[in-house]
């Protein structure tokens, strides 16, 4: 109530001292401030149950750090940029975002950036999208000791390189592949698996490209099972022997490795990677309702693409989500073969996206362009006079700043720029 009283007093004071356009600018800023403090549904859920999460779930430091970031994402008191129109005095404050992959807004932006970076690596050939899954009995080992997730990457990398080495005659053909770790299934439960984008061909040491159209999935399944179980046995020790023996017995044909039915064409590579490899754990659009105690969300079941809606207790929903937050500095995306090395001979390869086009692709990921393409309006065009707004002030380091001071400084700069225009 004190803040709203301050606003009313401030507007009355301004009415007698500045032109009406400046008053409209202040009101516009105030409305924008209120708009940006409307939380999305995930922020609301985690804010309502913050103490319960902290003191009953005992989250990992990485989980707590990302929860704090996500809750405060878009909070103007943590800093931002003030834009102003030098023609009419209209002001617009754009708060900084948290840049957490766990945040639905920033996670989507992160996915866009990573998708673009991955697409710049790809050679201009078809790529096969393979998914390497594990036995359900092994999942808890990766949950209890997250360093074991490295075994998944090592196993997939060794298997793909061995697959191509078996095809080699007298030349050493090396494929390029990108591995992306997903720890979630569509129902948000813990289900670590690797998505791997593999070039349909390999590059020899003497600059010769060999196309490969057939992948031996029998070999991939058996080799991946063997490589992973051996890696885990070395890491865990003798206590893992019984589990390993049971996996060999129950999966005599290897762990399930399958290919997506549609291949990754060079012309649509960015869209393909974004759809299958770059997606966040859950989008806010999949959360249907939140009552305070229960959360309803939906997904299409993997087995038959059947629409499924689940309603579960809110704390169960939170537990399902936060377990997918990786440890700090853990790499969820890794490159192998051609895409992991930097040799002068590899520069002869024709890339799917040329260096001349990369600037254009990066532009689509910028805040202003992304808003324009997604919502159809330019956020830096003044809604009153349709002129481009300019930046007046930046507050950073997520330190809290008094909004009255922010307003006074911004107005002072706005007057100075308009008088010199």
Sequence positions of predicted segments:
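Beta->alpha loop/short-helix hinge microenvironment recognizer with preference
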Residues: 2, 14-16, 21-421
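Serine-biased, low-complexity intrinsically disordered segments, primarily in secretory-pathway proteins
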Residues: 4-6
């Amino acid at each position: 109530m004190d803040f709203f009283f301050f606003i009313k007093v401030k507007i009355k004071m301004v009415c007698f001292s500045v032109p009406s356009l400046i008053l409209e600018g202040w009101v516009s800023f105030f409305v924008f401030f209120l708009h940006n403090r409307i939380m999305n549904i995930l922020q609301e859920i985690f804010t309502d149950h913050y103490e319960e999460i902290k003191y009953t779930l005992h989250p990992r430091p990485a989980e707590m750090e990302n929860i704090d970031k996500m809750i405060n994402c878009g909070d103007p008191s943590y800093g931002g940029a003030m834009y102003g129109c030098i023609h009419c005095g209209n002001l617009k404050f754009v708060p900084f975002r948290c840049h957490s992959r766990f945040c639905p807004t920033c996670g989507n932006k992160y996915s866009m950036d990573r998708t673009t970076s991955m697409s710049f690596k790809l050679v201009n050939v078809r790529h096969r999208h393979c998914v390497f899954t594990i036995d359900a009995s092994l999942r808890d080992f990766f949950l209890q000791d997250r360093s074991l997730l490295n075994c998944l990457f090592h196993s997939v990398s060794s298997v793909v390189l061995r697959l191509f080495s078996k095809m080699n005659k007298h030349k050493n053909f090396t494929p390029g592949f990108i591995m992306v770790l997903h720890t979630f299934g569509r129902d948000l439960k813990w289900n670590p698996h690797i998505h791997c984008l593999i070039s349909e061909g390999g590059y020899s040491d003497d600059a010769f490209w060999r196309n490969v159209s057939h992948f031996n999935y029998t070999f991939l399944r058996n080799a991946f099972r063997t490589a992973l179980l051996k890696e885990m046995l070395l890491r865990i020790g003798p206590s893992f022997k019984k589990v390993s023996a049971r996996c060999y017995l129950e999966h005599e044909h290897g762990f399930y490795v399958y290919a997506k039915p549609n291949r990754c064409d060079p012309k649509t590579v960015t869209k393909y990677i974004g759809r299958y490899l770059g997606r966040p754990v859950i989008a806010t659009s999949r959360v249907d309702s939140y009552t305070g105690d229960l959360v309803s969300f939906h997904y299409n079941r993997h087995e038959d693409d059947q629409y499924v809606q689940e309603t579960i207790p809110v704390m169960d929903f939170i537990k399902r989500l936060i377990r997918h937050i990786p440890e700090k500095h853990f790499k969820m995306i890794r490159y192998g073969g051609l895409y992991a090395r930097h040799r002068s001979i590899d520069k002869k390869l024709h890339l799917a996206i040329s260096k001349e086009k990369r600037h254009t692709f990066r532009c689509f990921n910028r805040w202003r362009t992304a808003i324009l393409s997604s919502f159809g309006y330019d956020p830096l065009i003044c809604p009153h006079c349709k002129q481009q707004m300019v930046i007046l002030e930046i507050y950073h380091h997520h330190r809290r700043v008094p909004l009255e001071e922010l307003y006074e400084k911004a107005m002072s700069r706005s007057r100075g720029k308009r008088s010199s225009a």
